[in-house]
UniProtKB/Swiss-Prot annotation:
It comes from Acidiphilium organovorum. The keyword Transport applies. It is a multi-pass membrane protein. This is Reaction center protein L chain. InterPro entries: Photo_II_D1/D2_sf, Photo_RC_L, Photo_RC_L/M, Photo_RC_L/M_CS. Belongs to the reaction center PufL/M/PsbA/D family. The gene is pufL. A ubiquinone binds at F193. Keywords: Bacteriochlorophyll, Cell inner membrane, Cell membrane, Chlorophyll, Chromophore, Electron transport, Iron, Magnesium, Membrane, Metal-binding, Photosynthesis, Reaction center, Transmembrane, Transmembrane helix, Transport.
Amino acid sequence: YWVGPFYVGFFGVTAAFFIMLGTALIIWGAALGPTWNIWQISIAPPDLSYGLGLAPLAKGGLWQIITVCAIGAFGSWALREVEISRKLGIGLHVPAAFSVAIFAYVTLEVIRPLLMGAWGNGFPYGIMSHLDWVSNTGYAYLNFEYNPMHMVAVTLFFTTTLALALHGSLVLAAINPPAGETVKFAEHEDTFFRDFIGYSIGTLGIHRLGLFLALGAGFASATCILLSGPFWTQGWPSWWGWWLHLPIWQFGGH
């Protein structure tokens, strides 16, 4: 059914349920905490001593239930997108893309803690506390920027913005000509990039490329944190030791 211009459907109802329940639990957790400062409110995961077991509500149990609500809300939203796509007779590109973001979240809060043996390895729900978790996790591996998949993820994020900024600026340039000139179309846009870099991916191709880069960035970011802990426990700079032992360095007299 519809609410005004919005299609709700079964999964819209389940999404609303999980969103409202999760939000209410966050407010409850904030009420149990020491402050109502929006920057300092934090819903922490259970202590590592609880392992993969259930914790009391005030000691991480709320975090566990909120995580279930978040996954339920995200999954319901993706399935609602599937319903809408099928009604419109279009492809499932939007829910498929959103599923990569869901995968990244589930990796952080479920898959990685499962592999490491404790829910306490998940990140807390809070603005400053979550940023502290990111910082502490990075320092736990000495320099997280040496994580090869982190490098790939950052590269893809920046490349996504570069590619779509080039596309967006080209469109604005084409449809906003100087006074007295006519509006330009796709053939002018293609010609510009052929003259500029020798190749134009085309108006459809740039959107496919942007989607590919964005999804690759999300997948690589999930992979980079999944590797840290379950599969690599040392500092990431030491991972690059293999580079120093390549046969090529035996040449040159050094």
